[in-house]
Design a protein with these regions (language model features):
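Charge-rich, low-complexity N-terminal segments
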Residues: 1-132
Length: 132
C-alpha cells in the first residue's frame, strides 16, 4: 500500500484551561499554557492518505477551505465553534481536523493526522476515538 503525506501550516493562539476548574487547578495542569491572555503557535499539519489520491491541487483546495480558513490566524477558544466547550489541546485540534476532513477526501482515505505544535511536541490521530 502506498501512503501520501501532504503538509500544511497555520498560525493560531489558544488558552489551555477548563472553565469548570479554578485558575489554580488550570495552572497546575496546564502550566504557562493556562495564561488567560493566551499564547500562539505556528502549527504544521501532516495528512496521511491512502488509496487513490486526486490531484494535489484539489486536496489543497479542500484543506484550505475546510481547515485553514477556519483555524489560521484565529484565537481558537473564542473564534472556532468546535473549541467553545473543548480545550484546544494539540490532541483535540488534531481530532477536529480529522473530523473535518475524513469524509471529504473520497476516493482517498484519511489514514492519519499529525499536528506539530512545537519542535518538541506533536500528536498523531488515526480516527479511532470519538470526538469529545
Amino acid at each position: 500500500m502506498i501512503r501520501v503525506v501532504r503538509r500544511y501550516e497555520f498560525s493560531a493562539a489558544h488558552v489551555l484551561a477548563r472553565s469548570d476548574w479554578s485558575d489554580a487547578r488550570n495552572r497546575a495542569v496546564y502550566g504557562k499554557c493556562a495564561n488567560p491572555a493566551g499564547h500562539g503557535h505556528n502549527y504544521r499539519i501532516e495528512l496521511t492518505l491512502e488509496g487513490v489520491v486526486d490531484a494535489a491541487a484539489a486536496l489543497d483546495e479542500i484543506v484550505a477551505k475546510r481547515v485553514l480558513a477556519e483555524l489560521d490566524g484565529r484565537f481558537l477558544n473564542q473564534e472556532v465553534a468546535a473549541f467553545a466547550r473543548v480545550v484546544p489541546t494539540a490532541e483535540n485540534i488534531a481530532r477536529h481536523i480529522w473530523d473535518t476532513l475524513a469524509d471529504t477526501l473520497s476516493p482517498a482515505r484519511l489514514a492519519g493526522v499529525r499536528l506539530v505544535e512545537t519542535s518538541n511536541n506533536s500528536v498523531e490521530y488515526f480516527g479511532s476515538e470519538p470526538s469529545p
